[in-house]
Every structure is written in C-alpha cells, then in structure tokens.
UniProtKB/Swiss-Prot annotation:
Enzyme Commission number(s) from the entry: 4.3.1.18
Name of the gene encoding the protein in the UniProt record: dsdA
Descriptive protein name: D-serine dehydratase
GO biological process: D-serine catabolic process; isoleucine biosynthetic process
Cofactors required: pyridoxal 5'-phosphate
Keywords: Lyase, Pyridoxal phosphate
Length: 442
C-alpha cells in the first residue's frame, strides 16, 4: 500500500498504527448488537444448525466403526470441558491482574480423529458431501444405518470422486484423514508454514500433499484452480464455506449441554466470555454463531490473533474485510501459530459475524509460548502455540473498565462470570516438537 493511502487509513483508524508496529492490541467492538438484530446478517438460521446436528447424528454409527476412538462416545466427535484453577492463579500472578470469575478450557485440542477444532467443520463438510453423492446415486436413504458406508461397494463408489482443500495444517489434517477413510481421492494444498509432521501424517493416510513456498492464501487459490479442471473434484473452500461454518456451529448446543451437566449457569447475572483463536475465521465464526444461538446475549465472544497475522481485526475494524490483507499494511504474516497464519480474513465470516463479536485482540508468539509452558506446568495440559491465543483474553476483559462500562457489567456479574478459553489444537503434536515448544516459554 503506498504511503499516502497508508497515512489516510491510519488517520481514519489510529489502531492500525499499533498493528503495523506489531504491538499487542485489543479492540472492543463498539458495533455489537443483540442477537435478534445481528442474526439476519449471518444468512443462516437455527434450523440450519439443527440440520447439521441431525446429519452428524446420522453419521454417528459410521464414525463409531470407522474410528474406534469415537466408539465410547457413540460416534459423536466432542471434547472435554475442564476447569483450570491453577492456570488462573498463574496468569493472575504473571500479569498482576485478577481474573474475576472462573477460568475453563474447552479441549478441542484433544478431539478424536484429528486433534483440533477442525475435526468439527472439516469432517462435517466431507460427510455432508459424501451423503449428498450417495443420496443422489440412490445408494443411501436418510433412514439407513450409515455404517453401511464402510462396505467395499461404497469405497468403490466414492473412489470415483476427489476432494481438494488449501490449509496451513489442521483443516487439511481433518479433511484428509476423513476423506481417505471414506474412499475419496484427496489432495491437500499446504502453505509454507505447515508443520512437517502434519504433512507426514497426511501422507501416511494416502493423502496427496502439494507444498507451496507461499502463504495460506496462495495454497487456497491453487487448490481452487486445480479443482476447477476436474468435474468430479469437490473443493472445500475455507474462506467462504457455509457448510464448514455450520459444522463448527453445532458446538454451541453441545457446550450448552455440557454446562447443564456440570451445573454451570449462564444468564444475565452469570455472563459467559469465550475466547477463540482466529485464522481465516471459519472455525471461530461458526463456533461463535452456535454459541450465540445457544446462550443468546449472555455470551460474549472474542477473537484472538497473532501480532503478525491480525487479518480479522484489521478487516472488521476498517470495514474492508477481505478487501485488505495484513501484507497490504506491511505485516509479514509469519508466526509460530501456524493455524492462525492467515493474511486475509474470510469476507463471509467478517460480514456475517461483526455485530455478534464483542472484541478482537492480538498477542505475540512469545506470549503464546509462555502460556503454553505455564499451562503444561500448572495443569499438565499440552497445546500447540495457536491454541493458547485465547488464554490472553480474560486479562484483557478484566482489565478494561471501558469495556465493562460499554456493556454495563457490575462487579458482581464479573465475579459470577465464566471465562472459557477455546483450545484449538495440539493433541497430536509429536513429543519432540512439543518439547521444542515448551523450551521456548519462560
């Protein structure tokens, strides 16, 4: 971006100067509305989420047999919700900032099949596509026991079709593993920041991995191009997919059920704050949408991004969405948080969700490494760097009087609050790689 343009952008949005300087930045969104006002802009409804929920239930018997690690849960891919009181104390001590309320962790990092939040959206979209093909071919009815999809005749049928996706790692992992298991031919287009072990794992499942020297945006574009030349190839579009988004959104009702099981209350007197790491935006956008449908105006969602990849904060704050990239303002999009290394946000998610998100913040790679090692020390839970992005949120919220006033929170409401950090990945990181991460924390 030329200097004059840049200067006028900064004059209009002074916060951009802090982003360019790679400062850890927090922006509380002044444009939030009630769910009732914001919902029409999403273009999806509660019924769409219910349909996704029903589809996953139809596939549960199949998943229970195809992936024995899901059998105990009846073929439902869901993660634990745990309190992390020792980490809460450690954060308070390190940052000299009390966290009012209780700190919880949602362990999507340990979801079965692919060990990340992408096991929600990625697997769901592959299943939805497989169902559509089988229904159209007259091989399946909605009333069938879907475990019949494991038969050789279905493997043969699906082998005529292929799936392609562009990914920094975790989405490719979930789509690759699921597609290969069903019988699709699958190609994952991986960006330069994708971890070697993720590529190796995909190849071990018979997935074709195409590697690029460039970033996520290029991998997605190339994947899209390659798929266009083949009528039997289905491209899963992380930047624009409504189906992926709905796969993530099912998490809202599931979390509501987990809260009920644990006797946790969410209402006006007991607000819920949720902190979601954000790459291109599909995962956190879908989850936040589901949470809003489940808890209404009593849940407050925040997106967390690396200082080197603040694409969603930049897009929503300036209102330019996918018309601007972090590279346009001179930021390199290089971060240890490989799952979040995205320079241009999803225009669909930004426009759909901007009224339903309370804020956005950035944190440095070093902050993620520090919190990664504290969590391992205090709670014995090991995550990948990206997954710690949400962990910086509770201090930002508890330290901001202006945010609390904007929403009229009393001291008592904050004392009764629940702070939920969404841990997005790390359950499958190899030991030696994890030890390197741990060594980088202070």
């Amino acid at each position: 971006m030329e200097n004059a343009k840049m200067n006028s952008l900064i004059a209009q949005y002074p916060l951009v100067e802090d982003l360019v300087a790679l400062k850890e930045t927090t922006w509380f969104n002044p444009g939030t509305t009630s769910l009732a006002e914001g919902l029409p802009y999403v273009g999806l409804t509660e019924q769409d989420v219910q349909d996704a929920h029903a589809r996953l239930s139809r596939f549960a018997p199949y998943l229970a047999k195809a992936f024995p690690e899901t059998a105990a849960a009846g073929g439902i891919i869901e993660s634990e919700l745990v309190a992390i009181p020792a980490m809460q104390k450690r954060l308070e001590k390190e940052y000299h900032q009390p966290i009012a309320g209780q700190l919880l962790l949602k362990k999507d990092s340990h979801l079965p099949i692919s060990g990340s939040i992408k096991a929600r959206g990625g697997i769901y979209e592959v299943l939805a596509h497989a169902e559509k093909l089988a229904l159209e071919a007259g091989l399946l009815t909605l009333e069938d026991d879907y475990s019949k999809l494991l038969s050789p005749e279905f493997k043969q049928f699906f082998s005529q079709y292929s799936i392609a996706v562009g990914s920094t790692g975790n989405l490719g992992l979930s789509i690759g593993i699921m597609s290969a298991r069903i019988g699709f031919k699958v190609t994952v287009h991986m960006s330069a920041d994708a971890r070697a072990w993720k590529k190796a794992k995909l190849r071990s499942h018979g997935v074709t991995v195409v590697e690029y020297e460039q970033d996520y945006g290029v991998a997605v574009e190339e994947g899209r191009k390659a798929a266009q030349s083949d009528p039997n190839c289905f491209f899963i579009d992380d930047e624009n997919s409504r189906t992926l988004f709905l796969g993530y959104s099912v998490a809202g009702q599931r979390l509501k059920a987990q809260f009920a099981q644990q006797g946790r209350i969410v209402n006006a007197d007991n607000p819920l704050f949720v902190y979601l790491p954000c790459g291109v935006g599909g995962g956190p956008g879908g989850v936040a949408f589901g949470l809003k449908l489940a808890f209404g105006d009593h849940v407050h969602c925040f997106f967390a991004e690396p200082t080197h990849s603040p694409c969603m904060l930049l897009g929503v704050h300036t209102g330019l969405h996918d018309q601007i990239s972090v590279q346009d303002i001179g930021i390199d999009n290089l971060t240890a948080a490989d799952g979040l290394a995205v320079g241009r946000a999803s225009g669909f998610v930004g426009r759909a969700m901007e009224r339903l998100l309370d804020g956005f913040y950035t944190l440095s790679d070093q902050t993620m490494y520090d919190m990664l090692s504290w969590l391992a020390q205090e709670e014995g839970i090991r995550l990948e760097p990206s997954a710690l992005a949400g962990m910086a949120g509770p201090q930002r919220v508890c330290a901001s009087v202006s945010y609390q006033q904007m929403h009229g929170f009393s001291a008592e409401q904050l004392r009764n609050a629940t702070h939920l950090v969404w841990a997005t990945g790390g359950g499958m990181v190899p030991e030696e790689e994890m030890n390197q991460y741990l060594a980088k924390g202070r």
